[in-house]
């Protein structure tokens, strides 16, 4: 079920404050965050976030196409190495 329109998008306040100060100061340093649940807002465009995926911080550069999505969508938590190849000489 989708979030109600009247509530608006969810963003952690500490992340919003860090993004506003980075925009005002013109800082290019990435913003480190654990908040994968925060929605990407239009004022985040052009910023870089380091999003934690449970093991390391993944750099996420925000562009216009990402607005409305969550930060966690761009930092995968699981690694799939692929299925094993068939063994040809098995008989």
UniProtKB/Swiss-Prot annotation:
SUPFAM superfamilies (alphabetical): Ribosomal protein S19 (SSF54570)
Biological processes annotated in GO: ribosomal small subunit assembly; translation
Any GO CC annotation of this UniProt entry: small ribosomal subunit
Keywords from the named record: Ribonucleoprotein, Ribosomal protein, RNA-binding, rRNA-binding
Pfam families assigned: Ribosomal_S19 (PF00203)
InterPro entries found in the cross-reference section: Ribosomal_uS19, Ribosomal_uS19_bac-type, Ribosomal_uS19_CS, Ribosomal_uS19_SF
Disulfide bonds: none
Cited Gene3D superfamilies: 30s Ribosomal Protein S19, Chain A (3.30.860.10)
Molecular function in Gene Ontology: rRNA binding; structural constituent of ribosome
Functional description taken from the UniProt entry: Protein S19 forms a complex with S13 that binds strongly to the 16S ribosomal RNA.
NCBIfam families noted in UniProt: rpsS_bact
Family assignment from sequence similarity: Belongs to the universal ribosomal protein uS19 family.
Name this protein carries in UniProt: Small ribosomal subunit protein uS19
Gene name in the database record: rpsS
